[in-house]
Amino acid sequence: MDVAVVREPFNLEQYDRIFLNHEPWVIICNKEHFLAKRPEGVRVSELQDASLIIPIRQPIQNEINSWFNEIASERNIFCLYNSITSVMGFAEHNLGVIICPESAKNLINRETLTYRKIIDPVHESGTYLVKKHLQLMATATEKFWKYVEHQTKSNPSKYKESMR
């Protein structure tokens, strides 16, 4: 693989990287779920009573667990997912609440599911385009890398990486 798009947290030390964007973490749940009744968003403390469906990647699990550790709260992990579409049925049948990046809202069945931002505290996740340090790339891949690099440098306000 020449380049990849990865979501933080990720060990970025061994990679050249281009920051792409930040997006908030949200929950996806059945419209009848008690958390769906919170139009302003949900607090991490409100998630302690929900059956949670979280990503399988260990660094992301550690980050989500740290949210609960910060408030000394328990959590109920119902299942782990690698592909969010594979667990949408659990949320549709009101078996659990999916924690995911906001962009996943574009995949939901809006007749049965809704999403709410996690607001207290707010948590965000960044995405990066990465390649290994000093990696030789195919000409087309190298041109793509330089194009993305140019786009992010020519519009720094859109691609501003925050300190986490």
Question: Residue spans of the language-model regions?
Answer:
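Hydrophobic residues within well-ordered alpha-helices
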Residues: 47, 89-95, 129
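Short beta-strand-centered segments that line the small-molecule binding cleft or hinge
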Residues: 1-29, 38, 66-67, 92-95, ...
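Short acidic active-site motifs
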Residues: 13-16, 43, 85-87
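Short beta-strand-to-loop elements that line the ligand-binding cleft
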Residues: 7, 54, 73-83
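Secondary-structure junction motif
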Residues: 50-72, 137-145, 155-161
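Short coil/turn segments
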Residues: 8-10, 25, 30-40, 50-61, ...
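Short beta-strand and adjacent tight-turn residues that come in two discontinuous sequence segments
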Residues: 1-6, 82, 99-101, 105
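A late-sequence structural motif
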Residues: 114-158
